[in-house]
């Protein structure tokens, strides 16, 4: 949802490129959870505690880096307030195992393999992103939504952790025929598809009609909009 919004508007990681104005949404699918992982020995219990710490914000040009900057800003922090590193999550996790990294951001579905592996070898804390600061983020950037990582998702994390997420979304072009996209949307939300989604990957169970429009920051394709109005998801 974040990348689609940036591409459509020519902002974020897309600010030096022409906007892709024909992008249209079919559906929000499942949450890509924002993980702020900290070493348990780092003393980091909140985003505020990142000040002065060694923090990986992901690679330059990545969506995660832009998301991390937005979150830091909501807490009154910038990259200059932390000892910023720009590493892939697996590299940041390796540094943390070696005692050379205090925290890192990761955006992806849970359980994330790199974090699960790290948690099995090193005591970690999953830092909450919540309260007024999270409300500021979701209020200013419609592609963010509240999310919760359940207790026990990662070894040593024994309580639910409230955080934010961006959506994995099904995107198409405004050039695609209305009737075709209508039928695709209708097929996604029929009973047979529901059975397949529930029987497959864990993320499939999170693909629901109730959340089909969550965090959608670009226009719906007219075919998808037609279906959602018929289904009562969108009002007149």
Regions from the PLM with identified roles:
Residues 87, 91, 97-98, 108-126, ...:
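An extracytoplasmic/periplasmic, membrane-proximal ligand-sensing/linker region
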Residues 17-19, 37-39, 151:
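Short gly/ser/thr-rich secondary-structure transition/capping motifs
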Residues 2, 11-13, 42, 79, ...:
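Pocket-lining segment of extracytoplasmic ligand-binding domains
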Residues 25, 35-37, 56-57, 103-107, ...:
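Structural recognition of the beta-strand scaffold that forms the well-ordered cores
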Residues 6, 34-36, 136:
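Short, solvent-exposed loop/turn elements at domain surfaces
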